[in-house]
Amino acid sequence: MVTKSSRWQMGMVFAGLLCAVEGSFVIRTVTAAGGAPPVKMTKEEDRKKMMDALGIESLRPGKAGRDKTDPNFANYDESKANPYPKLPDPLTLKNGKKVTKASEWWNKRRPEIVEDFDREVYGRVPKNMPKVKWEVVNTTNGKNGDVDVVTKQLLGVVDNSSYPDIEVKIQLSVTTPANAKGPVPVIMQFGGGFGAPGGAAAAPNAGPPYGPNAFSPARGGGFGAPGAAAGAGRGAAGGPGAPRAGAAGAPAGGAGRGPAAGAAFGAGGGRGPQGPTWQQQVLAKGWGYASLNPGSIQADNGDNLTLGIIGLMNKGQPRKPDDWGSLRAWAWGASRAIDYFETDKAVDAKHIAIEGHSRYGKAAVVAMAYEPRMWTVYVSSSGEGGAKLHRRNWGEIIENVAATSEYHWMAGNFLKYAGPKTWDDLPVDSHELIAMCAPRPVYLSAGKGGYDDEPNGDSWVDAKGTFLAGVGAGPVYRLLGAKDMGVTEFPARETEVGTNADLAFRQHASGHTDGPNWPFFLEFSAKHLK
């Protein structure tokens, strides 16, 4: 039994292990007696080690995302966007047989697709994952707008008895209406921290210290340059917001820059200059919201792959080629959050949605695909490695994600498709990731995009490639008795398709932000509340 006194002592030790420095955290690692400490490698060293294991001598460079005069500038010409127009058929087994029954999808084809994503794209979650013990460390009564709310701050302590050198403490907050008459649906967002008391959005880069091996989260999860400091991508308001530049330059060995200039930043999301925050929009429906800190699960960089949950499971050693990357680790953390929600009487655990923007949009669709308890998902500007088709030559491409700034998101095997192999050699594509979510509702989103929309647009994430992935998942939705978007032609900007279906898409008229489409996602979700 944990007493108030012991909780206080735990909190003081927890806070004392870290020192906040300009939005990041200095971590003091204490090596267990008799245990080998985690291997220390830079991301360049780690990626080179993986390339050597795969027999890869060099990788193709990623595209530049900002400078239109760069000879390696990203392609935004639709006539050059589809070098590999034939996608893998989600309803054809590897033996060539067509899938015509739902049972064949569940028992045969879906497992084939999962295996390909596990081995080649996102990596495998280790067997015998440790237990996570959730503890409410703070409860606050307050207001968000004009709604009385209760906010719980939690730590999910991962059992590290197999390797005490590494501690993982998952940071989660959940806010519910104080006057709710029963359990409420919860929209969980990747990318926050504990949040501010009373449920208000925390300021960018603010928050309490993280666990002893946890790291400063990429709060907005935005682009910035590959290798940019965590926090590039969303504004405190989250609507169009004030433009703000990302970190300058890619590190040596990295890809070209991703577009950050003009993108909105921060943790809040969901409003323009004066409108309600996304959290207030959720509360207006009588629902709750949650914030899951990915940095408390696994660092968003390749320098720390021997730490975090990945390092814990590998006992501080480097990854194997099919080991999981950060996206799959963050998705695992979302599943553990659902474990907690199933014990919280204020939460309707059958209606947990997940939302993520940019890199966290990638994590959100991965979480939805792998976690059957997830109700619905809002995938915002996820780009390459998320809902965008891998085979599309538009904006961010496989080579960008294989750079030292981003490779840690994926399995090591993913590097092959930026080196000796081509995009077309991938056994799967992102329409099949969306199909893994079927028949549950999926909302796909991106901002304006095209050569003339830069540098203040969302071209990098390929709105059309995301839409086409949704189209490609449609046959699986129909097979399972669900409704696809009902269209195959890319819709006009600000035209929602799939409004009354199980798959929906909308391209808004702003830049790299999730703000404008929050109201549409919430209306979409409400139609699927059963």
Q: Which residues fall in each region the model found?
A:
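Conserved strand-to-loop "acid loop" that flanks and positions the catalytic carboxylate
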Residues: 438-461, 508-510
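Alpha/beta-hydrolase fold nucleophile elbow
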Residues: 346-358
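Mobile cap/lid helix-loop segments that gate and shape the active-site cleft of serine hydrolases
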Residues: 309-313, 320, 336, 376-433, ...
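Glycine-rich nucleophile elbow surrounding the catalytic serine of serine-hydrolase chemistry
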Residues: 356-368
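C-terminal catalytic histidine-bearing segment of alpha/beta-hydrolase fold enzymes
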Residues: 409, 457, 464, 468-530
